[in-house]
Curated annotation (Swiss-Prot):
Places the protein is found: Cell membrane; Golgi apparatus membrane; Golgi apparatus, trans-Golgi network membrane; Recycling endosome membrane
Keywords annotated in UniProt: Cell membrane, Cytoplasmic vesicle, Endosome, Exocytosis, Golgi apparatus, Membrane, Protein transport, Synapse, Transmembrane, Transmembrane helix, Transport
Name listed for the protein in its UniProt record: Secretory carrier-associated membrane protein 5B
One Pfam family, short name: SCAMP
Segments in the Cytoplasmic topological domain: 1-39, 89-102, 170-235
Cystine pairings recorded for this chain: none
Phylogenetic placement of the source organism: Eukaryota, Metazoa, Chordata, Craniata, Vertebrata
One GO biological process term: protein transport
Similarity comment text for this entry: Belongs to the SCAMP family. SCAMP5 subfamily.
GO CC terms: Golgi membrane; plasma membrane; recycling endosome membrane; synaptic vesicle membrane; trans-Golgi network membrane
Database matches in PANTHER family: SECRETORY CARRIER-ASSOCIATED MEMBRANE PROTEIN 5A, SECRETORY CARRIER-ASSOCIATED MEMBRANE PROTEIN SCAMP
Record topology, Extracellular segments: 61-67, 126-148
């Protein structure tokens, strides 16, 4: 299997760091999974942007009379959850769609369920936890209306992330179960080491692409090789 240069994240040249991952939906992900994989990537981006907006909301919270703890925690959540969510749940589902790996599907279900729980907690907004959720935002209207309005923006975004995360988890789980996936298959991959064998992964990727192409071919209309012009035998 040829080594491809890492291209993600696309860092500016002045940063003395190199990309850590290779990511290309068009070449790695079969057509039947590409849309879902991209939507999960967009969900990760939305979650990261929401954490950034939450930092601004906590700054407004601080300016309006709130404590500095929330702002500090919001900054911590931004620099911690953005890379961790990419590594812990997006990369597993990316590799699962790429190689049809039950082990990576299970890793995604485990970590993404945790992501869903965290998103719900963030949307609720317990004061002192560094998130502008519903409780924190609504309760701050009595202190500073302007700051509370700003805090509502990340609150709505956290709610959207939680809802979209639930929908995504349900959709991927339905697909996985419908395709015959199970915990026993994931355990078998773990026992045999197939989940980290590059040759096995390449074979699985080729099989996934072949299955996708076969499904597309079956959906195409069939035409006869011999033209039929419909001439009548009667003169």
């Amino acid at each position: 299997m040829s080594d491809k240069p890492n291209n993600f994240p696309p860092l500016p040249r002045f940063i003395p760091l190199k990309p850590c991952f290779y990511q290309d939906f068009d070449t790695d992900i079969p057509d039947v999974h590409r849309t879902t994989a991209k939507r999960l990537y967009y969900l990760w981006m939305l979650n990261s942007i929401t954490l950034g907006v939450n930092l601004i909301g906590c700054l407004a919270w601080l300016i309006g009379g709130g404590g500095a703890t929330n702002f500090g925690l919001a900054f911590l959540w931004l620099i911690l959850f953005t890379p961790c969510s990419y590594v812990c749940w997006f990369r597993p589902i990316y590799k699962a769609f790429k190689t049809d790996s039950s082990f990576n599907f299970m890793a995604f279900f485990f970590t993404f369920t945790g992501q869903l729980v965290i998103s719900i907690i963030q949307a609720v907004g317990i004061p002192g936890w560094g998130v502008c959720g519903w409780i924190a935002s609504i309760s701050f209207f009595g202190t500073n209306v302007g700051s509370a309005v700003v805090m509502l923006i990340p609150t709505i975004m956290f709610t959207a992330v939680a809802v979209l995360s639930f929908v995504a988890l349900t959709k991927v789980h339905r697909f996985y179960r419908g395709a015959g996936g199970s915990m026993s298959k994931a355990q078998e991959e773990w026992t045999t080491g197939a989940w980290k064998n590059p040759h096995v992964q390449q074979a699985a990727q080729n099989a996934a692409f072949g299955a996708a192409q076969g499904a597309m071919t079956q959906n195409e209309p069939q035409y006869s090789a011999t033209p039929n012009y419909g001439y009548s035998n009667q003169m």
